[in-house]
Amino acid sequence: MVKSSKELLAKDESKVLAELQKNSKESIDTIAKHCGFSRQKVWRIIKHLEDNKIIWGYIAIADEEQNGLKHFVLLVKRNSVSFDTSVKKELILEKLDDYLPGVARIEDIFFTHGSFDAVVTFYVADIISAKKLVQEIYKRVGKYLGEYLLLETLFPVRKKGLKNPQIKGLVEYL
């Protein structure tokens, strides 16, 4: 049975996407070789993925401790008060980084289903700065939020799907 062209395109896109997620710095020639496609086909697929916002961007994964930053995870529960439209826009469209400019760099924000309603991961210099960021968040939108849990990351085993290249030296901490 012949598959439709849409099914084939989706399968080809997923192959290219998987290669980009392994290492987005690879050349189009290398990606094409790994996928078994022509260079032009890979270029067209990547362009299509970018145009349709399936690929949001490309990032470099760095050891932020080298820059004097520590990684924190903030788990937040909502309370029963409904969000105002302006607060929704502030949380989704604006940057939480602006709450403490030059102090905090927000990595990820997820709205979740489960014990907590949101997860915010960020980098700051120390626990005091992390607590200041939490205080600033609660100062601005605290009436909509319940309890929170602040966690400091000791070290990443994997980051963005890639294994930490220094993991062998960190095994003793497990």
Q: What is each of the regions a protein language model found here?
A:
Residues 1-174:
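A compositional/biophysical signature of low hydrophobicity enriched in polar/charged and small residues
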